[in-house]
């Protein structure tokens, strides 16, 4: 399925490298507001210069483009995804796909009406070790606590502290630690345990209102989950599920389930280490789904997507983040 990419930031380049591996998803076009960055990306990934667009509508009119990969600031996702679906294109949108459940439901309805696929690009759900974690979570007894940490000092934080406002720290672009990083922790948790019964978010705010870091609490009937994400500091990242009969440890965190360690009473530890990039498995999972779109896989993806967006929306409401 031929891909047109909108956006030329770091994640667009990362995904383009994965698409460039032998897959069924070649990149045939790129759209950037800046022609120079679009041309540079075209040269890097052997995209014809004639397929470099500075107007999104022009790329959507390109009949060779079958799927649009959206890698732009969060606040642009809804309108760009809607336009792509209306143009008859499948959509793969970077996380978080949209800020609200209402927007997501509108896009899902539109995709269903037009027999198109709407997918969210996130590394967690297609990683083999995450699949193992879901299975082993049933073997460690009653769950008592869950904790996920994704702390990553942003490459744009110093500029932000010096008076600039990059999109990742701009409320107008739906930036911040919750939307950018805690989304991985949310996906990790809801994909295993389903919807929480209550959501609370405790952010550290900058003067402009953005959350540069924060702790998200997800309450389940029999346990509480803590999800920590920071863009203003760094730490050792991991995801841990602790039960009465054992525990599951994922490192280096919910966005990259590279190492899985399972300990169970009376059994030898189970360890799985995977060296390939998490984006590799993301692209493989998406590619396999598009080749053979099974209803059960589609339903699971939609359920996880909707649960994650619902948590994001509830967390922002709880913390009075007005975007």
Regions found by a protein language model. Name each.
Residues 1-46, 290, 321:
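N-terminal Rossmann-like dinucleotide-binding module
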Residues 40-49, 106-113:
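Short, conserved SAM-binding/catalytic segment
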Residues 50-108:
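Beta-loop-alpha module in the N-terminal Rossmann-like domain of NAD(P)-dependent dehydrogenases
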Residues 67-69, 105, 285-323:
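C-terminal helix-rich "cap/oligomerization" subdomain common to oxidoreductases
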Residues 93-94, 118-120, 250:
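Hydrophobic residues in well-ordered beta-strands that form the structural core
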Residues 106-124, 142-145:
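Rossmann-fold dehydrogenase core element
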Residues 127-197:
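Predominantly a Rossmann-like dinucleotide-binding segment in NAD(P)-dependent oxidoreductases
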Residues 185-255, 284-293:
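Contiguous beta-strand/loop segments that form the cofactor/metal-binding neighborhood of enzyme cores
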């Amino acid at each position: 399925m031929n891909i047109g990419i909108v956006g030329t930031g770091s994640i667009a380049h990362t995904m383009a490298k994965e698409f460039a591996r032998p897959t069924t998803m070649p990149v045939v076009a790129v759209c950037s507001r800046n022609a120079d960055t679009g041309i540079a990306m075209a040269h890097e990934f052997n995209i014809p210069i004639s397929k470099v667009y500075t107007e999104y509508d022009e790329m959507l009119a390109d009949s060779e483009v079958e799927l649009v990969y959206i890698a732009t600031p969060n606040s642009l996702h809804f309108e760009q995804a809607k336009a792509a679906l209306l143009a008859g294109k499948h959509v793969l949108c970077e996380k978080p796909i949209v800020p609200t459940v209402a927007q997501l439901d509108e896009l899902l309805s539109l995709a269903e009406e037009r027999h198109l696929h709407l997918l969210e690009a996130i590394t967690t759900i297609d990683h083999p070790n995450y699949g193992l974690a879901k299975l082993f979570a049933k073997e460690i007894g009653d769950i008592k606590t869950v904790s996920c940490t994704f702390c990553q000092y942003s490459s744009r934080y110093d500029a932000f502290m010096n008076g600039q406002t990059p999109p990742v720290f701009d409320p107008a672009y739906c930036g911040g630690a919750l939307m950018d990083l805690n989304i991985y922790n949310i996906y990790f948790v809801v994909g295993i345990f389903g919807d929480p019964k209550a959501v609370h978010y405790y952010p550290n705010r900058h003067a402009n209102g953005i959350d540069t870091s924060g702790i998200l609490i997800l309450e389940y009937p029999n346990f509480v989950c803590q999800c920590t994400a920071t863009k203003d500091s760094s730490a050792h990242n991991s995801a841990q599920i602790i039960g009465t009969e054992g525990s599951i440890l994922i490192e280096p965190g919910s966005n990259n389930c590279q190492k899985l360690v399972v300990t169970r009473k009376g059994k030898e530890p189970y360890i799985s280490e995977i060296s390939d990039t998490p984006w590799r498995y993301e692209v493989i999972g998406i590619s396999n789904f598009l080749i053979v779109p099974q209803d059960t896989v589609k339903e699971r993806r939609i359920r996880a997507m909707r649960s994650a967006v619902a948590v994001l929306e509830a967390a922002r409401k709880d913390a009075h983040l007005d975007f």
